[in-house]
């Protein structure tokens, strides 16, 4: 169909051997791009704990995948700081470590305001990150679902957007706000 696809691969609940076997199966199937992520803590755990024989971090996973020479590797990036990061500078430096380990580009967590992405892009450039940073987009199917996901990811919900969705939901027009928000960002 002419679409580029990227398989997701995480460090969660797998040994290094199992993870690299999955990557090898992807390569054999013709997959050339991987989104390499640490992954979220398994349900019921407050924090991520690596498998005893697994990759301890996304940096380790990226380095191992890069060593195979078989993939373009994309990694996650957080314009509003990963919830586990000490601060935004440390988070940008962690992204730099992933790029230096062999990632070819980054895809951001979603955000609601373009300035959030632009500030992040500039902070990355200031740290010497030159790899492409692709803005992440979240199609809003349910405003309640989007707010829950934003809370999990540390994504700030602008008050004016929240008010627009809350008002529209009461009036049965939630979909029209999604479209209007999209159109507003297309013209910025």
Which positions does each model-derived feature cover?
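Active-site pocket-lining/capping segments in soluble small-molecule metabolic enzymes
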Residues: 52-78, 127-179
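Hydrophobic faces of well-ordered beta-strands that scaffold small-molecule active sites
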Residues: 5-9, 36, 73-76, 106-108, ...
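Conserved small/polar residues in nucleotide/adenosyl-binding loops
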Residues: 180-187
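Active-site mouth loops of central-metabolism enzymes
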Residues: 7-16, 76-89, 169-179
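Glycine-rich anion/phosphate-binding loops
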Residues: 13-25
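Alpha/beta enzyme core
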Residues: 23-34, 40-45, 50, 59-72, ...
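Active-site-adjacent beta->alpha loops and helix N-cap segments on the catalytic face
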Residues: 16-18, 44-61, 112-124
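Short, well-ordered coil/turn segments that N-cap beta-strands
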Residues: 1-5, 31-32, 69-72, 103-104, ...
